[in-house]
Swiss-Prot record:
Keywords: Cytoplasm, GTP-binding, Hydrolase, Magnesium, Metal-binding, Nucleotide-binding
Limits of the OBG-type G domain: 160-341
Name of the protein: GTPase Obg
Protein family per UniProt: Belongs to the TRAFAC class OBG-HflX-like GTPase superfamily. OBG GTPase family.
Annotated Obg domain residues: 2-159
Residues noted as binding GTP in the record, renumbered to the chain: 166-173, 191-195, 212-215, 292-295, 322-324
A GO cellular-component term linked to this record: cytoplasm
GO BP term, pick one: ribosome biogenesis
Native organism: Mycolicibacterium smegmatis (strain ATCC 700084 / mc(2)155)
Amino acid sequence: MPRFVDRVVIHARAGNGGNGCASVHREKFKPLGGPDGGNGGRGGSVILVVDPQVHTLLDFHFHPHVVAPSGKPGAGSNRDGAAGIDLEVRVPDGTVVLDENGRMLADLVGAGTRFEAAAGGRGGLGNAALASRARKAPGFALLGEKGQERDLTLELKTVADVGLIGFPSAGKSSLVSTISAAKPKIADYPFTTLVPNLGVVSAGENTYTVADVPGLIPGASEGRGLGLDFLRHLERCAVLVHVVDCATMEPGRDPISDIEALEAELAAYTPTLQGDSALGDLASRPRAVVLNKIDVPDARELADFVRDEVAGRFGWPVYEISTVSRDGLRPLIFALWEMVKKYRDAQPVAAPRRPIIRPIPVDESGFTISSDGEGGFIVRGTRPERWIAQTDFNNDEAVGYLGDRLARLGVEDELLKRGAKPGCAVTIGDVTFDWEPQTPAGVDVTMTGRGTDIRLEQTDRVGAAERKAARRERRQPGESGGEDS
């Protein structure tokens, strides 16, 4: 039997963005070709996709690292790097995604449902994209951003209409194998079923699914036995069925006490999907009771004796069956279908809607400055930290461009207000450097000559405006001479 895994921790790492390219256009008879470095490609993202053909998380148990490809760097002649291909990871229907703190990020139900587990990094800009009127020929490019990287917990919660619960060896697996084509492991010792088993049951022209959950014992909601690991599979079941062993010889066991003990465990269990599921908690689900093994004479007598008491105390329908002689199975199959149908009819049918995208403006201009306790300062903010990651500190011009951007954002002025002195340590992101003011406060940083091509300043080529002014001056003497004559 294939190994069943319903809870794994994966390490998702998206691809990094490609670096931008710093190059100059070279062509015959064009000495001032200008910058033509292309942008880097976007890194690939890690996307979880529901696949109905996948039924377990076993692959992630052996291969927990999921890595998407990175983007390609830019090249000369304005060639942008290729974007990394998104990595689509197939997961079973009913997978719940949790973050490191146990907070639910996504509940993946339905074939084709997608969730971006890790976003790819943005590609760096080439020097062609960085060129401006004040910086005509940048000799640098921006680095690509790193892709998102985080640990995620995947939990599989079986999607079934009916969930069978009961003590070990109550006959749940036998019932599933009898009313469906499922072939679970069946034996005459407790905890034979170690994994949930799903079966598709036909009630005339209608079908529904039944889940056989491993046997529960008192204390399952606190971790005893196997119940805590598999109670989560009951969260999506619309109907819960108590399978009671009427032929048990264990002391202190009877149908009434078995049902009460299991109900106490269901009431103590807190579903992960309680706040987001339309089913509500486990205590509010419709119930049914199945008195099993009535092919044994003593078991039939006990079932006839407690049938009315169970129905009167709990108010649930009671059915007497035998998976060996198949007595009572047909009425049970159709009765469960009626309960499932009643639940399905009560669910509102969502009309197909056209998706409407309303982008939310994100203000990334904010930043905070705090003291590090040793005479230095720590700058935190989306833009400053991203700019640090994009800067090639081996390129003096790129470092100067970073300083200009920080000054325009107001970081430099705020450091001066907080008493920062030249040479003090300033930490932004993962980089700590000795701070030196770029320009005195109040001076426009774009007036600096950084990032310009000195050849453009030395050229004697006459511009269009200068030629127009020269023509105007040449006309003026002729016009005045004509008036004198």
